[in-house]
């Protein structure tokens, strides 16, 4: 079975990579993919071999937590953690101001010894309370032979603090006798923690934006429902509703579960209500619901009220299925992310080695102040290195892109489908049910005697959608079982240059094969069982949501409504998202490639007496992560 499980405690890409690596080593886990911005793990496992409790215990040992109890509110846990992070960040800023006032002698405490001892106490308090998680996490990682961003923070602040403590008590005895001017760096150890916490606070706030679409979908389901029990109507928790229960839904209320209308009324008609289904289908006109009509969870009666019999409840509703599909898509990984994850696993050890080399080089060539210079340069290297920016580059863009698609009633199966969409250069479309719909104004008992152009009508926006696709350089082929005259008529009406008539299901599959053999990347759009072979063969398969379940199961992209303009929108969104991923990765790698040598003091080799200090390094590191998330959020406003 496949399940998306919330994960608590991740701070960087090394965290998610370590959790993913651990899960994939467990017997009974077929595959696991961990999303840092999504704060979740998508796990495909055999429950007869391994339980959720066993997985939770293994991840707890690493210092993280899998939330497997469905009664536990993940939102409440995350809110508490966010409030605690805000409190620690604010207090750390106060500690930073205090230590700066003392270290810079803005507050005169008399002797240098007293000044250093007060700074030591401030730094220690900051480390023990505000920075405690860095040391606890890095210790747990060390026990399991792994490392993450917390390891770099713990190492850098620990080294700066211990060296400063040594100088506070033994500086004169050890350094002054050798003619070396010594300093303490408590301000650096405090400021590093402050800037890292500030960066994480801003990052969490920004990451909330990437998950806004899924939260909006979850908010579509009500917390309670009105259950009819004889002559009584009671308001009960949604979780208590069972299949077969009779429910009453009033104007403005959200439909609690999927079901069938058994009675309806409104001021317009005595036997029907009107329900806004735009949040599911994108259709702006309220749908008429009479006895026997199907209603979906999350939709809202705009006029009238009705009673319904519950048919699908809980995780079986269409809304729950959509939410699950979007969560799985957001938790999936683009091919490039696999490479980044491997880099994240070795990034921290590599940075630690670079810091060690930096220390040794400065110690050997640094002259009288060799040791202090060597230590501060190594600390700056440890602080400025940022695996978070690399780790966030791909998943944040994917979360925003897939979430934006879902808000437009476009369901994308996974990251690979989103990435493939941008490469499409040919679209093959079915006619009946995809481009056209039956004419509602005719008597269907006499339809066979009517001209073909009167039996069907072109879907609204179909012509505009086909024109937009062709403007994007995508060839469109229409497949129809009609005779040539009818097929040519509908192709011309839709603005399609290439069409095939009298086709059988096998012909659709053959056309897809021929186009692929010619080097084309083919997208197939259809809505029926006779399209499934071609859908399965296409590079990208697109199903109409009102089509058959078989077509939707095969498809990589599902359009929940009838508006075909969603197809060019999906392709443009794919192009924007992939471009954003590469943009994010470029800046994340450039940041590390440029900043690590500058922190190590490379400019001294060219006669420039400047390098990035540990305090500035921590600020730059925080900025790099936040900037990647904010850059991804630009997708929400891109057209």
Enumerate the language-model features and the residues they cover.
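Soluble-to-membrane junctions at the N-terminal ends of transmembrane alpha-helices
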Residues: 75-94, 117, 137-160, 323-355, ...
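Membrane-embedded alpha-helical bundles of multi-pass transporters
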Residues: 108-111, 143, 162, 404, ...
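Conserved catalytic phosphorylation-site environment of P-type ATPases
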Residues: 280, 376, 386-447, 451, ...
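Flexible metal-binding regulatory segments at protein termini and peripheral loops
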Residues: 1-116, 140, 216, 232-233, ...
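Conserved ATP-binding TGD loop and adjacent catalytic N/P-domain core of P-type ATPases
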Residues: 17, 38, 412, 422, ...
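Conserved cytosolic catalytic loops of P-type ATPases
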Residues: 4, 27-49, 53, 183-186, ...
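Transmembrane helix-loop-helix hairpins at the membrane interface
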Residues: 84-224, 342, 612-615
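Juxtamembrane coupling segments of multi-pass membrane pumps/enzymes
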Residues: 175, 188-251, 289, 411-413, ...
């Amino acid at each position: 079975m496949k399940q998306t499980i919330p994960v608590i405690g991740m701070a960087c890409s090394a965290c998610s990579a370590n959790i993913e690596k651990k899960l994939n080593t467990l017997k009974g886990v077929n595959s696991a993919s961990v999303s840092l911005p999504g704060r979740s793990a998508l796990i495909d496992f055999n429950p007869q071999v391994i339980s959720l409790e066993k997985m939770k215990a293994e991840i707890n040992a690493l210092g993280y937590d899998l939330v497997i109890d469905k009664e536990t509110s993940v939102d409440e846990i995350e809110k508490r953690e966010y409030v605690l992070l805000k409190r620690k960040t604010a207090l750390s800023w106060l500690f930073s101001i205090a230590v700066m006032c003392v270290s810079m002698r803005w507050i005169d405490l008399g002797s240098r010894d007293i000044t250093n001892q007060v700074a030591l106490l401030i730094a220690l308090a900051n480390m023990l309370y505000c920075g405690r998680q860095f040391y606890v996490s890095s210790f747990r990682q060390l026990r399991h032979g792994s490392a993450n961003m917390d390891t770099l923070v713990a190492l850098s602040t620990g080294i700066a603090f211990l060296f400063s403590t040594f100088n506070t008590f033994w500086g004169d005895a050890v350094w002054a006798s050798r003619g070396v001017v010594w300093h303490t760096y408590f301000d650096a150890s405090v400021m590093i923690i402050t800037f890292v916490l500030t960066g994480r606070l801003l990052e969490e706030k920004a990451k909330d934006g990437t998950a806004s679409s899924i939260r909006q979908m979850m908010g579509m389901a009500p917390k309670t429902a009105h259950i009819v029990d004889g002559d009584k109507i009671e308001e009960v928790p949604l979780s208590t509703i069972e299949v077969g229960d009779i429910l009453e839904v009033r104007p403005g209320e959200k439909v609690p579960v999927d079901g069938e209308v058994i009675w309806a009324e409104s001021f317009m008609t005595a036997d029907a209500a009107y329900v806004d289904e735009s949040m599911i289908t994108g259709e702006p006109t309220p749908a008429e619901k009479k006895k026997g009509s199907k209603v979906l969870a999350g939709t809202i009666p705009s006029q009238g009220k009705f009673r319904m019999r519950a048919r699908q409840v809980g995780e079986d509703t269409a809304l729950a299925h959509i939410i699950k599909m979007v969560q799985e898509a957001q938790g999936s990984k683009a091919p490039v992310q696999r490479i980044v994850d491997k880099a994240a696993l070795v990034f921290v050890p590599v940075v630690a080695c670079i810091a060690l080399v930096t220390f040794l080089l400065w110690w050997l060539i640094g002259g009288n102040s060799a040791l202090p210079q060597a230590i501060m340069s190594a600390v700056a290297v440890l602080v400025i290195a940022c695996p978070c920016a690399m780790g966030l580059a791909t998943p944040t863009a994917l979360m925003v892109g897939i979430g934006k698609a879902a808000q437009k009633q476009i369901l994308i199966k996974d990251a690979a489908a989103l990435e493939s969409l941008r490469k499409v250069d040919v679209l093959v479309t079915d006619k009946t049910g995809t481009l056209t719909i039956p004419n509602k104004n005719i008597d269907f008992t006499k339809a066979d005697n009517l001209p073909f152009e009167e039996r069907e009508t072109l879907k609204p926006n179909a012509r505009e959608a086909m024109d937009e696709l062709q403007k994007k350089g995508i060839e469109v082929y229409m497949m129809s079982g009609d005779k040539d005259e009818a097929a040519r008529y509908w192709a011309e009406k839709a603005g399609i240059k290439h069409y095939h008539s009298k086709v059988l299901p096998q012909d659709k599959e053959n056309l897809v094969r021929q186009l692929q053999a010619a080097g084309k990347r083919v997208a197939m759009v259809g809505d029926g069982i006779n399209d499934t072979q071609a859908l399965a063969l296409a590079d990208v398969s697109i199903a109409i949501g009102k089509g058959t379940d078989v077509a939707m199961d095969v498809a990589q992209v599902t359009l929940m409504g009838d508006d075909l303009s969603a197809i060019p929108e999906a392709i443009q969104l794919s192009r924007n998202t992939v471009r954003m991923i590469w943009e994010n990765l470029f800046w994340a790698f450039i940041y590390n490639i440029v900043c690590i040598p500058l922190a190590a003091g490379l400019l001294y080799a060219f006669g420039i007496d400047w390098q990035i200090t540990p305090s500035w390094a921590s600020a730059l590191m925080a900025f790099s992560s936040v900037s990647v998330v904010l850059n991804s959020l630009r997708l929400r406003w891109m057209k």
